[in-house]
Design a protein with these regions (language model features):
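N-terminal leader/targeting and accessory segments in enzymes
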Residues: 1-93, 215, 230, 249-254, ...
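Adenine nucleotide phosphate-binding catalytic loops in nucleotide-utilizing enzymes
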Residues: 2-3, 7, 67, 185-192, ...
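Gly/Ser/Thr-rich beta-alpha loop segments that engage phosphate groups in nucleotides
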Residues: 10-15, 32, 54, 110, ...
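Phosphate-binding loop of NTP-binding sites
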Residues: 20-23, 43-44, 57, 68-230, ...
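Residues in the short beta-alpha loop(s) of Rossmann-like NAD(P)-binding domains
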Residues: 32-34, 136, 213-214, 237, ...
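Generic structural signal for helix capping and beta-alpha/helix-loop junctions
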Residues: 38, 59, 97, 140-141, ...
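A short acidic, often aromatic-flanked loop/helix-cap motif at beta-alpha or helix-coil junctions
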Residues: 55-59, 93-97, 237-243, 258
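A short, glycine/Asx- and small/polar-enriched loop/turn
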Residues: 59-62, 149-151, 246, 257-259
Length: 329
């Protein structure tokens, strides 16, 4: 049995990959400075987790995967290289996992965790049984990753350290784009350039779905079109044909008794022409309406039932640490 060792297994990114490999039948071990909640969950699932980094931890491993936070001076990295064990960065390993899958990658400064989770839940409810990696624990599942039997692979595309440039998306979602991670991107232009490279990973028949309300995300639409790719713009209000012949728009927003918004989602993505479905979310905030529009756009691009997709989104319960209810008084 192939053994894969993860250095920095306690983070949301590596813990998710570790879970996928464990579910796929690999022997999985890992180490981190402390036993984080993610690491503890993996322990409960049968993964051996070492607290602290020591050369002996990699002994017998076939592959080693390291977090972007782990330097090449880490004792386990040095031991693996000296032993001739291949050491992969997270981004390189993720790209391999997505091979031969329909990759759906969600990027953006804000909202990517919830949007990734929404899409994963929606596709699951529609019977597609996707694999997914989310940067937080999904309330509907209680985990941040799962290896499904379907062809879709939904992944949160982390721009930190340009991780998302190792992915293989067929559908890319960009929620918004603001200057972040100045240690990686000294200027906004540096960050925007990385996002241009990200959408450049789409195949010629791939699709970019982006918010037309956000200047940074909307700026990517004409660039994707210039490359011949399909583009979809989404927003709460406004002219949807700007930069995109295909659109998804929310209209008639009203708060509902569950704490979220009820609204009509209209789109011209389907071959049948403009159609509209009613959506009633239980997760609060207009930002989640936007996240739902991105998710519905994915469903429309994949040719799935928008009515059933809307029902599934109404059952979405959110993700951990994102407006999470911790108790009631």
């Amino acid at each position: 049995m192939t053994r894969v060792h993860f250095i920095g297994i306690g983070g949301s990114g590596l813990s998710a990959i570790a879970r996928l490999l464990k579910e796929s039948g690999y022997q999985v071990t890992g180490s981190d400075k402390t036993l984080t909640p993610f690491a503890a969950d993996l322990q409960a699932a049968g993964v051996t987790v070492y607290v602290g980094h020591h050369p002996r931890n990699v002994s017998g491993a076939d592959w080693v995967v390291k977090s972007s936070a782990i330097s090449d001076d880490n004792p386990e990295v040095r031991a693996a290289l000296q032993a001739g064990i291949p050491v992969y960065k997270r981004s390189d390993f993720l790209g391999q996992l997505m091979t031969n899958k329909t990759g759906i990658a969600v990027a953006g400064t804000h909202g990517k965790t919830t949007t990734t989770a929404m899409i994963a839940w929606m596709l699951s409810a529609l019977g597609r049984d996707p694999s997914f990696i989310v940067g937080g624990v999904m309330a509907n599942y209680g985990v941040n990753a799962r290896m499904g039997k379907g062809n879709a692979f939904v992944i949160e595309a982390d721009e930190y350290d340009r991780m998302f440039l190792g992915l293989q998306p067929r559908i890319a979602v960009v929620t918004n784009l603001e200057h972040d991670h100045p240690d990686c991107y000294p200027t906004f232009e540096d960050m925007f350039s990385a996002f241009e490279q990200f959408i450049g990973l789409l195949p010629p028949d791939g699709t970019l779905i982006a918010s037309s309300e956000d200047e940074g995300a909307a700026s990517l639409l004409p660039r994707a079109r210039k490359g011949g790719r399909h583009v979809v713009a989404y927003s709460l209000q406004g002219e949807m044909t700007i930069n995109s012949p295909q659109w998804m728009q929310a209209r008639s927003l009203k708060t509902n008794e569950r704490g979220g918004f009820t609204f009509n989602a209209s789109t011209n993505i389907a071959e049948a022409g403009v159609q509209s479905v009613s959506v009633s979310l239980q997760v609060p905030g207009e930002h989640n309406v936007r996240n739902a529009l991105a998710s519905l756009s994915v469903a429309a691009v994949m040719g799935l039932s928008l009515k059933n997709a809307a029902i599934a989104l109404g059952e979405f319960k959110g993700t951990g640490r994102r407006f999470q209810v911790l108790g009631e008084k």
